[in-house]
Amino acid sequence: MMGKHIQLSFAILIMFTIFVLGAVGDVDQGYKQQCYKTIDVNLCVTGECKKMCVRRFKQAAGMCIKSVPSAPAPNRCRCIYHC
């Protein structure tokens, strides 16, 4: 009977240890906030926008947006990056 109690206690200790180590690992990874910068251009081309964003910020994504919904074509390049 005593052996089963020790096995249960040991199993609970192992599970608790794994949980604590997992929680510490999540905290160590950290969370990077996303920022964006909008650049005015005459006519935004997706490929050029992405290249421009990567030049300004090492790891970035770029997308073309319109300054106003009624604009005929996208005229702004929005860079999204970790700040």
Swiss-Prot record:
The record's InterPro entries line, in alphabetical order, gives: DEFL (IPR010851)
Against Pfam families, the record matches this protein to:
SLR1-BP (PF07333)
What does the UniProt entry say about where the protein is found?
Secreted
Broad class of the protein's primary localization = secreted
Disulfide connectivity? C35-C83, C44-C64, C49-C77, C53-C79
Q: Which GO terms describe its biological process?
A: defense response to fungus; killing of cells of another organism
The coiled-coil regions, if any, are none
Alphabetically ordered keywords of this record: Antimicrobial, Disulfide bond, Fungicide, Plant defense, Secreted, Signal
Give me the Gene Ontology terms describing cellular component. extracellular region
Q: Tell me the leader sequence span.
A: 1-25
**Family, similarity comment:** Belongs to the DEFL family.
Q: What is this protein called?
A: Putative defensin-like protein 150
**Gene encoding the protein:** LCR32
